[in-house]
Amino acid sequence: MGQKINPIGFRLGTTQGHHSLWFAQPKNYSEGLQEDQKIRNYIKNYVQKNMKTSSGVEGIARIEIQKRIDLIQIIIYMGFPKILIESRPRGIEELQMNLQKEFNSVNRKLNIAITRIEKPYGNPNILAEFIAGQLKNRVSFRKAMKKAIELTEQADTKGIQVQIAGRIDGKEIARVEWIREGRVPLQTIRAKIDYCSYTVRTIYGVLGIKIWIFIEGE
């Protein structure tokens, strides 16, 4: 049987980079990782509460965290930062202050920057949010997957694979459905592949969405 490996972890150091950049003593390492996870969850929850979008897409592609002794630098890569800024003009300052209080980082300054990504629908996280929104609104899964593929084609990607697993369309028995368009060379390390695994709660239960996007050549 083929062993499935995370495509991002498989390519670290070649075409993919780390999203957390810092050094720590081995005994403090787990604390640092947990802190990163809490920061990411806090930011996602804040954006979810304060962003009013019709599609239900928050548009966070990834959150990079760089730590120094006296500074925590957080870079939020977003597809639609304008919506967040329009709905909360002072949102970034507010988020920065709240995070500083939450993590009690008195000795360390906390700085948040937002970077817009050029082609939002070429990112698997944003695409997974889009599909999740469609499934919550009871759109047929095939229609949602086809629409997602149309959106990625506009973003000039070389290939995409979308997989949805669970009680699809409320059927009694859980199953896995997938669709592929273009090339997705998972075995080639030089091929830059972006990947995302996303969980969505629908009225029928939990569905898992996985997306692989082949961005650029081998």
Swiss-Prot record:
It holds the Pfam family Ribosomal_S3_C. The keyword Chloroplast applies. Its main location: plastid. PROSITE patterns: KH_TYPE_2, RIBOSOMAL_S3. GO terms for molecular function: rRNA binding; structural constituent of ribosome. Residues 47-118 form the KH type-2 domain. Keywords: Chloroplast, Plastid, Ribonucleoprotein, Ribosomal protein, RNA-binding, rRNA-binding. It is found in: Plastid, Chloroplast. The lineage of its organism: Eukaryota, Viridiplantae, Streptophyta, Embryophyta, Tracheophyta. One of its GO terms (biological process) is translation. One of its GO terms (cellular component) is chloroplast. This is Small ribosomal subunit protein uS3c.
